[in-house]
Amino acid sequence: MADQAKLLFYNKMMDRTAIKHLIRRLISHFGITFTANILDQIKTLGFHQATNASISLGIDDLLTAPLKSWLIQDAEKQGYSSEQHHRYGSVHSVEKLRQLIETWYATSEYLKQEMNPNFRMTDPLNPVHMMSFSGARGSISQVHQLVGMRGLMSDPQGQIIDLPIQNNFREGLSLTEYIISCYGARKGVVDTAVRTSDAGYLTRRLVEVVQHIVVRKKDCGTLRGILLNSNRDGRRSIQPFSQQRLIGRVLADNLYVNMRCIATRNQDISNELARRLVISQVRQIYIRSPLTCKSMFCICQLCYGWNLTYNHLVELGEAVGIIAGQSIGEPGTQLTLRTFHTGGVFTGDIAEHIRTPFNGIIKFDEDLVYATRTRHGHPAWLCQDNLPVSIESKEKIHNFIVPAQSLLLVQNNQYVGSKQVIGQIRTTKSPLKERVKKPIYSNLDGELHWDTTVRHLSEHIHNNIHRVVKSGHIWILSGKLHNLSKTSLFFYQNQDKIHVQSPSITNYKSLPNSSEKDTKRDLDFIDSNIAKKESQTSNFGFSFSKITPNPSDSTNILSNIELKRNRRKNRVILLLGRVKSRYRKKSYSSFVLDIPNNGILNQGDILAISESPQYQTEISGIIKYGTIKVDSVGKREYIGDNEKTTTFRSRYKILKGGNFFLIPEEVYTIYQPSSHIFVSNNSIIEPGTQITFNITSRGGGLVQIKKVRKIFEIRILPGNIYYPKRLHKISKQTDILIPPGQKIFDEFKSDNWIYLQWITPYRKKTFLPVRPVLEYIISNHSFIEISSTFTYSRYRDIIQVQAAEYIFYEDGEEVRIRNNTSSIQLVQTCLVVNWKEPSIVRVAYVSPIEIRFNNILKTFLQISLIEFSNAYVEKGNSRASLKRLFSNQPFYSNNANNHLLSQFPINHPGVVRRLSDQGTDRSFVVLLPSDSYQSFYSPCHDGRNRRKQFVESRYKISFCEKEISERSNTLFLSFNRKKFLKLKEKLTNSFSSFDHHCMMQTTERLGLLGTVHSIAHYSLYSHRIINKNFFLSKDLDIDNSRAISQNSNWYILDENRVICGFDLIDSTQEDLSNRPHYLSVPCDVIIPFVNLGQFICEGVSLYEHETSYQSGQIIAIYQESVMIRLSKPYLATKGATVHSNYGDILKEGDTLITLIYERLRSGDIIQGLPKVEQLLEARSINSVSLDLEKNFLFWNNTMIRLVGNFWSHFLGVKTSIEQCQLFLVNKVQKVYRSQGVQISDKHIEIIVRQMTSKVITLEDGMANVFSPGELIELSRAQRMNRALKESISHKPIVLGMTKASLNTTSFISEASFQETTRVLARAALQGRIDWLKGLKENVVPGSVVPTGTGSREVICQIDIEKRKELGLLKTKNNKIFIRKIRDIFFYHEKVSISKNPKYIHMRLKKPVLKEINI
């Protein structure tokens, strides 16, 4: 019994924490037995008082906080605002989810904090309040779910569900909330998705790896230990230097405070000593650890420390290994079973907010901050250094300093209210995070478009992966994709043109079902010379009326040109006849059509190409021009290498035939160091010589090596080497081509062309390689008869096609054969389109068409022309494949007076686009909305300049010319935004008066559907005005009524995925200014520039009082309205990945982009258990630690003592493995402590010790002892190195739990864990012996396990320790003791040996033999 003065006295309310502290002090003062008696009395007292109070729990006792409705309403308002910003494209889905999670988490936490004050004010004696807050039953989180709100839950994969449970159990859950709640709790069939088996399997592996660890010694005698440093990790989640981590450990060295020793070596740390150390703020404590214990297959008392159950040193024979495994695995099981986990799962650290003390104007230096985004996607300003900020009001000024790396949420000189959040202070230690990829899926069907900087990844050159290098929007243009099976009756091919007049279609039906077998497929052939065409009604499912085409708009089918389709290569072959000879029949030359995807051909464009095999080469070399003459200016164009990559290449037109040469050589680019190159410069090699490890020369010759930065370029020059003495007509240092028959050296003439190249090595004689040359000859006249090809064409007096030959390389340019190319074409014959009257700008629409005539299917070429006299035509010939969506449904349209128009079918020209879908039996047919071409033509040549001078002189408005293409300029008005001019009269009147002298007329033509003027590419030329020419009136009204002479129809694909037609002027031809919704803007207001093709987001103001209610692209601008094609913007931040090409068609649900963001490593235990398993299985971690700077400083200070040390490499390895062990211990602790689970460090250290106890032998070790790559115990390797003359080289390795369990000294333990057949077969072949030292290998055969405080070997060990301490162990009794103990211990190291020299000499002869036999 303790003294009366030391008795404990408490006079306060006792909660759970106070009860714990009381029990701990009672055990330390009175012991376990007396403490149990006291606690039994306290229990009886508690039951007595509870019985007298009659406390019971009813549903009426669950009181909901009155602030809940207001808090939820405010959170819903913030969620709606976040959803609205996401719809605008201001934030992406990750930022929206992040803000939603933090909003509801803050709401839930605030509601939890308001519970206790609410109970205290309304009902202090509420049973729920008394039981939960006293710790008797239930926790605050559980009560919060009863009377507060359930909060956010996570799914089985650990992802947070973005729909919070707003109700509590008192109010009742809805069906949706109940299903979501089943994920977080254990109810229903959803429980099968919760991975409860993972925690059990984790426990089994942990126990398996440490089941043989038993306390068998009192002191191993080690001088090593681990260092506990209070500054190692300052995060709030884990405190490495705390009182709880010190209790029960043993000091490895004396401990001094202010030069005074307060604790000695091998002293255990009690509660009082731990409290003194924490109060004294000792920074470093050197303690003993299982990681540094010298015992090989066991552990000693002092390295393990206290048994925390009894608060004294662990007893000998204690199976601490199994205790450690269960201590780590069981909390995971309990957490998975939701014993500790309740309610909300969000565990993020919210940054500290800066609030204003009063109303005022905030001021700071704008030069010290820069714009950025918050983690919620909101605009903010980041300050690099400490930022002085002042808030000024009428009466006072408040100055303060914002710490560095903090965010300001307001702008300079902005008015702020009292208690308003104006900034966020960055936490000193950010929690450890990991990079996670979040896929974003498309919400609608349509076409992909982006307006940000997106680059194709070099490592993904053969697929469609792109990387966003600058934050911007990814757009999906709405549309509908129609599928047609290959068996459907659809006779149009890709790029075929459907050309009919507007009044011609009287009846339009959908295509028939392909299952109708009686469908006739006869179609009359339309000859190209018939001016008035008439098609008969057929059974295709739709009918045509009489067609009377306009001569300038009709299509001409060239029936005398034969085309063939190559289905396999997806090519169209054009066959042209050669010139007939007297003895030979007419032969044909094949050309491959090279028509752009839009079908537009301009002056000088290439119609078809032909590649002759005689101008192909399969070897690399250098091109040298001979007698040919080539145009000096090359034509640069896009060449599609395949479906996924596009490159540039240049053509040079051959003006005059002759010859050119290819000088062969082999070229290799080496990215390896020079030590990997096996040949030397200016050496001569034979064919098949090894150049590097993986490169072998195909030919022989002179080797030339050139280094450019870190890249080596190796050239092998074939030919012969000559050392000339006398030259004939050849100047030195000049490379030259020598024709056949010319004498070069004494008695040397070549029968073929050769190339001489002078080479002067350093300090060596000049020599001359004579290199062979390949000659190519090009004739001076074209062998293709072009004139008769278009004889029957109505355009023969307008268009002409000429054959021209082009070469792809300049003089001296290198031809390089890549690994993936078999040959390269040097010369190409092309058919070029030219106009006979160059002054008239024309555009030709060319496309192949297949026509069935008497069951014979033939392919012909159709051509249509549109000409513009002195026009300014906006055009493009991009070969990029465009995909637009079109519907064949009828539409309804409303005019400005809201009059409903009659049902009107689609009746305008279009081009059918068929997109092949590889691997399926379907193909996609895409109809595209028509484009509008606009031409401005005038009878006078200088009308445009006169108009420009007239307006500039009268209204002082400047004009600017912007180059749109090589042959067209467009006129633009530009105003000074700062000083907006007030126009006194309408510009349109001035233009009208001016038009008496120089008329300007607007004409429209519907172009081919799917050309480069399609919707997506308007943004590339956003400064163009295509659909209409607008003029400004004095009231700044958009007045175009005077410039329109006829009723024009517009047909556009709208957001409802149907074709909409709009009349620009109704049938009464009334002036548009009289419409009721006419937009009028005052003179002092600046009209924003709205361009065709411009993308706008929802909520953007187009004019002063006009706001867009949908996100989309402007596809038409009218007198009083703007038409927008429905689009969906997706915000893509820097580093995001786009998974499709520009212009690709996506379906709803397809993966659009992948965002990369950071999240906390451990949240819910569902996420934490896999991380524990990842660490204990020694798997690689993808993310890099954020504390690189701190780790570098630590390593820098640690490694200074190793510099210059002879054993520095050994010490470095030792330090590395020690740091690795501590890293694993701390990481596992972080996962559990983030969930509030306390696990002693010694348990994890025992596991980590077994993971790092193996080493792997290297190749330079002794092969007769261990095989290279064999796993052995570290202690065994050290003993072998001491016994053998030649040491064994080995390196440390970290094994996972499973791998360590399968590499032990007991094959019985291994076979009972995994791979039983393999382990037993391998052990039998190796002749292994199991010494049955552990627990599991004794359980299998039914033997007594060698553990327990009362076991035979433990009693003998205790007897040995006592006799050693008393000095009673004599030499004569050594033999008896050794004989008795040998039956128990199987390793001689366990036996304590006296200092008798004779006995030591005798015993040292046996250990090596025993170890080898093992």
Swiss-Prot record:
GO terms for molecular function: DNA binding; DNA-directed RNA polymerase activity; zinc ion binding. Binds 1 Zn(2+) ion per subunit. GO terms for biological process: DNA-templated transcription. The keyword Plastid applies. Keywords: Chloroplast, DNA-directed RNA polymerase, Metal-binding, Nucleotidyltransferase, Plastid, Transcription, Transferase, Zinc. It is found in: Plastid, Chloroplast. It comes from the Eukaryota. Its cofactor is Zn(2+). Belongs to the RNA polymerase beta' chain family. RpoC2 subfamily. This is DNA-directed RNA polymerase subunit beta''. It comes from Angiopteris evecta (Mule's foot fern). The lineage of its organism: Eukaryota, Viridiplantae, Streptophyta, Embryophyta, Tracheophyta.
